[in-house]
């Protein structure tokens, strides 16, 4: 995406696939542009327009006009809703917090249909982005929501920001502070926003058992990740086999794994259901 400032206007262009959003806000005196729609709401602007893929618009105090029309193909980043989008923001007309709650509701319905994880003491989210998914799960299942560990954030960045995996793992681990009364002897179900390599997930489970948890169940709000993304540093990898879902497929299929990746990526196929189990 691109934003150009001139003496009399702004020119904004969204990337050709619409991977990331560009919003135009408007009030009685003019317009503004932002990546996150919540960025201008506290200043009195309201959502006025969202650019489509490859669309370019000219913005003045009187409004905006399209210089290049939007393309039809949209490939917006799903991780905006699942992980790194701000809860107050809307993308393509869908609020981030609402979408995360819906994901949790869907996970709870699936567990109910399968008859699994029905005697859990608490539903929890891997903070922060896992929390709204977990709240949706708790509301749908009727199981109480609790926070068995709290994330200490003042001295630590978001764990996906460091450029190497070792540092990402260290940040994630150091931020976790347990609430022992909510862990010891309890059956816990945690909802995480996604599972990429599985290293942080493993450390979270080990952390909970080390603090006395009786059972730990994990649910992922994001479908299995089979391919890395060149745009996101937390999903890039030296080898596709670093991705947990990809490794699991090879464990199930051996050297024939590559031939069935599409089937495992589709939740409606037998292989897709097998992977999730």
Regions found by a protein language model. Give the residues of each.
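N-terminal segments that mediate ammonia production and transfer
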Residues: 1-130, 138-180
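Feature representing long, continuous alpha-helical segments
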Residues: 101, 105, 109, 131, ...
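Generic enzyme active-site microenvironment
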Residues: 13, 190-191
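PRPP-dependent phosphoribosyltransferase catalytic core
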Residues: 8-10, 14, 21, 26, ...
């Amino acid at each position: 995406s691109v934003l150009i400032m001139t003496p009399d206007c702004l020119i904004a262009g969204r990337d050709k696939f619409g991977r990331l959003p560009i919003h135009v806000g408007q009030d009685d005196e003019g317009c503004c542009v932002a990546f996150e729609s919540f960025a201008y709401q506290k200043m009195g602007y309201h959502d006025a327009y969202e650019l489509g893929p490859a669309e370019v618009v000219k913005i003045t105090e009187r409004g905006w006009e399209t210089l290049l029309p939007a393309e039809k193909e949209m490939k917006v980043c799903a991780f905006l809703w699942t992980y790194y989008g701000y809860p107050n923001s809307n993308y393509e007309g869908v609020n981030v917090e609402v979408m995360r709650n819906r994901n949790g509701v869907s996970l709870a319905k699936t567990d109910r249909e399968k008859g699994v994880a029905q005697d859990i003491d608490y539903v929890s989210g891997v903070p922060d982005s896992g929390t709204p998914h977990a709240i949706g799960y708790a509301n749908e299942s009727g199981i109480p929501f609790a926070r068995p560990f709290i994330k200490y954030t003042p001295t630590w960045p978001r764990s996906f920001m460091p450029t190497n995996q070792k540092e990402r793992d260290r940040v994630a681990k150091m931020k976790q502070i347990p609430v022992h009364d909510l862990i010891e002897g309890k059956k816990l179900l945690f909802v995480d926003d996604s599972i990429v390599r599985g290293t942080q997930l493993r450390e979270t489970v080990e952390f909970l058992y080390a603090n006395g948890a009786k059972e730990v169940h994990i649910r992922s709000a994001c479908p299995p990740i089979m391919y890395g993304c060149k745009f996101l540093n937390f999903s890039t990898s030296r080898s596709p086999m670093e991705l947990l879902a990809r490794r699991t497929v090879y464990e199930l299929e051996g050297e024939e794994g590559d031939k069935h990746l599409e089937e495992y990526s589709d939740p409606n196929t037998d292989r897709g259901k097998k992977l999730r189990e």
